[in-house]
Amino acid sequence: MKFKVNNKEVYASTGGQPFDKNKPLIIFVHGSGLSHITWVLQTRYFAFHGYSVLAIDLPGHGYSEGPSIKSIEEQGKWVADVIDAVVMKEASLVGHSQGCLITLECASQFPNKVRSLALMGGAGAIPMNPELLELAEKGDPKAVDLMMDWAHGPAGHFGGHAVPGLHHINIGGTIVINGSVKNALGVDFRACDNYKNGFEAAKKIKCPTINILGDKDRMCPVKEGKKLADSIKSSEIVIIENCGHMILLEEADKALAILKKFIINHHPSK
């Protein structure tokens, strides 16, 4: 589905079903340099069970018009603009990694627009390794290889993707194919590194929130995820065992089961 946000063309996957304004809305926000395709194993369920789904491509990512937005605060506002653009009053937000920072910021700035918040592989701050940041800003594809290697837990390195023929780590190849290492991944990494408002934003969250963490996550370790959860008033924590940072791919079924229970409880469909 393509639509306009702030006069720029935006693409979002609707999970295989037409967008319906009469159904509750769930917006899925991807991580650094990635796109809507990371959510394919979660979005279809909700799209076929009474929800309208938007797995968005952030500006400058996937099929969305650029340029990439350079700060987490502005990206959070942009998600609120998406809700307005599709003429909806509110949405449940699901974010992964950088998407957690973005959805956290959106829920903080616009509490009346966010019904529930699911943070997957999140933390209150995501400081970047200086060498990795430099590689990404130079447009070096090695940045993608390092990111995907570091993002996956031990089991994720051996495959086992729920979709036959696909491999978890190879999803990073979409960044290289799209030529977006510098202009998407580099910008995203810099935005994460610059963002210092996470814990202040967390204190302002009013909606029900869940933190889904992987016990083998090296990018946003469990202890950092717990710090964020402790800063949010109405928050719960679920830890998935033997799982790295790419929870939505490494343990897609478990992630979906957790999301189903949480969203259906706090934002039921008719």
Model-derived features: positions:
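Alpha/beta-hydrolase fold catalytic core
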Residues: 1-27, 48-51, 88-89, 260-270
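Flexible "cap/lid" loop of the alpha/beta hydrolase fold
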Residues: 101-146
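Conserved alpha/beta-hydrolase catalytic His-Asp/Glu region
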Residues: 134-204
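Short beta-strand/loop motif that positions the catalytic acidic residue
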Residues: 205, 211-213, 217
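Conserved alpha/beta-hydrolase "acid-adjacent" motif
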Residues: 218-224
